Amino acid sequence: MTRHFLRDDDLSPTEQADILALAADLKKAPFSRRPLAGPRGVAVIFDKNSTRTRFSFDIGIAQLGGHAVVVDGLSTQLGRDETLQDTARVLSGYVDAIVWRTFGQHRLDAMAATATVPVVNALSDEFHPCQVLADLQTIAERKGSLNGLRLSYFGDGANNMAHSLMLGAVTAGVHVTVATPVGFTPDPSVLAAAKKRAEATGASVTVTVDADTAAAGADVLVTDTWTSMGQENDGLDRVKPFWPFQVNARLVGLADSEAIVLHCLPAHRGDEITNEVMDGPTSAIWDEAENRLHAQKALLVWLLER
């Protein structure tokens, strides 16, 4: 059966751990696995702008022996009303995997329903699961075992990073706290799914409007832009309510003395995170960005070699 990676809880705890272990191996030996040798092709489609996702998938696919066919959605029939089901059937005859960065999650679900090759969510409005694999790899590098750690996220609790962190981190046994302003809490269905997964792994999920409480004793502090792509004109005030959730030196000082800070990038320096923290000793942001390459390669190997 073809496996897809559309949201973080598509992986069981054991499957996630296997991928993270493989990511660590591939970081040490980048050319040790070549499931795409030939080269075999991977469709990499972008409906949204990208820097890290584009470079990391393109380079990673090459390191796996393959060829990335990178296009923007508007340059294909995806932008001219061809059904996603028809596109999935056609692409499945050309390539060995489909990597897609798009808008609504329902588009990925529709593509995966018909595709006979793996479909990978490279970011949607609702989830960013490839980023969270890289985040977990980075945390494991700095902290060792993930199980039992405390991760606190600060910012828009309804955005794709908050959703994926809840699902992905609790899968690894990490306790997650989402600190967010009133009116920006996570989607109830995602929160329920995260709590259900947490029950199975011994983790927990908490949502709070108190940033200081969330930071106290945390092992990992994570933030993201206050305005995600496509939200620029949604009519909501995405500045004033978020100032108490800025990741700054004072907030970091409330966390564990060996805490690390993550940000998926791009960052709006001086808004959700200060220069002092981003460039300071607690920052693991640059390792996190690099690990997109290794984590995504591991995911592709896992999907393709099944």
Curated annotation (Swiss-Prot):
Reactions catalysed: carbamoyl phosphate + L-ornithine = L-citrulline + phosphate + H(+)
Record localization: Cytoplasm
Coiled coil (residue ranges): none
Binding site for carbamoyl phosphate: 50-53, 77, 101, 128-131, 264-265, 292
Keyword flag tRNA-binding: no
Cellular component, GO, one term: cytoplasm
Molecular function terms from GO: amino acid binding; ornithine carbamoyltransferase activity
InterPro entries: Asp/Orn_carbamoyltranf_P-bd, Asp/Orn_carbamoylTrfase, Asp/Orn_carbamoylTrfase_sf, Asp_carbamoyltransf_Asp/Orn-bd, Orn/put_carbamltrans, OTCase_ArgI
Binding-site list for L-ornithine: 160, 224, 228-229
Keyword field: Amino-acid biosynthesis, Arginine biosynthesis, Cytoplasm, Transferase
Pfam families noted in UniProt: OTCace, OTCace_N
Enzyme class: transferase
Pathway where it operates: Amino-acid biosynthesis; L-arginine biosynthesis; L-arginine from L-ornithine and carbamoyl phosphate: step 1/3
Documented EC number(s): 2.1.3.3
Membership in a protein family: Belongs to the aspartate/ornithine carbamoyltransferase superfamily. OTCase family.
Protein's name in the database: Ornithine carbamoyltransferase
